Amino acid sequence: MRNFDANGPFRTALPKVAVDYFRVPGIDPAVTIHLRHKRLAGDLPRGEHPVVIFVHGATYPGTVVFDHAMFGGGSWLDYMAVHGFDAYSFDVRGYGLSSRPAEFGEGSRRGLPYARTPDAIADLKAVVDFVRARTPRSKVNLVGWSWGTAIAGGFASKYGELVRHIVMVSPLWIIRNSPVSAMSRWMTSAVPTLLQSGDLLGAYRSISKSEARRRWVRGLEPDVAEQLMPRAEFDGWWRALANVQGNDDESSESVEAPNGVMADLVDVWSAGQATYTPESISSPTLLLVGEWDVDTPAYMAQEIFSRLKGASYKRLEVLARGTHSMALEVNRVDLYRRTREFLQTRFI
């Protein structure tokens, strides 16, 4: 049995994991999507593994959320590959290594908010079509994190025949406060005092390293914060992020992220609406949230759970000692394991 150590490398030698990189044409001809694929090398012919596709959140791309090795161990993609999955992660348009519009790097306030939720769902559809063309499997598993749960949920509610299981980590749902306070929670740049429309936000926003760290561990005692995400681990992760989404290079003290999701937070989520209907999801669904998540608190997962009336099976779990970003923290392997076991289960 292959064992994965939360705080270090594999207890036994890491099996060789093959990695592939693809540039997937988007449904929008101006968009090209970066897709990463990991699997056990030489284990089974292509297409024999179960398929899982990871969908990232509002600020950080899949490249560094799902495939950055932490604490001397492997990444989430590595973990899934070692356990027999064809594991994929992609960057939504404007994020990471996917194509960016001209507004990127030319001033964050230029243009309309880029990469709104319907755009991200279109990117996921292009990825699913590409992956299904490479495998005989008719259905894929989806794992979404944060905003990625709205993307994956929106896809599953529209294309349920293509989805086997879906896992929602730190799921986003309708916000129980005003647009300004919602933006204060989510945005890491200056918040306008009055927001009548998300279109006022501009195409991109900047996020500083110091603000990203503060938001990650806010509400935690300093010693607990250092245990969950040691400063040295955060610094290494930030360098990887800045290398693909920074204003300059890996030494950059700030990164840029599209504002489409922020516009949706103002126009939709904080206005008492949602971008998808959980009632339309038919696949078995697992919701996972950390007990210290202040970005998407447990009430959001509870409300989604109550609306999953069409799901053939549903489960909600609160994981101890985890924040909104528990996928990158010291206890992350508990999250990995629960996700894997759910995806490997056949529900009747």
Language-model segments: which ranges?
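N-terminal cap/lid segment of alpha/beta-hydrolase-fold proteins
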Residues: 3-47
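Short, surface-exposed "cap/lid" segments of acyl-processing enzymes
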Residues: 42-89
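Conserved acidic catalytic loop of the alpha/beta-hydrolase fold
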Residues: 118-139
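Conserved hydrolase catalytic core segment
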Residues: 137-143, 147-178
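Alpha/beta-hydrolase
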Residues: 177, 181-286
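Conserved alpha/beta-hydrolase "acid-adjacent" motif
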Residues: 294-300
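Catalytic histidine neighborhood in serine/cysteine hydrolases
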Residues: 309-325
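Catalytic histidine-centered segment of alpha/beta-hydrolase-like enzymes
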Residues: 322-334
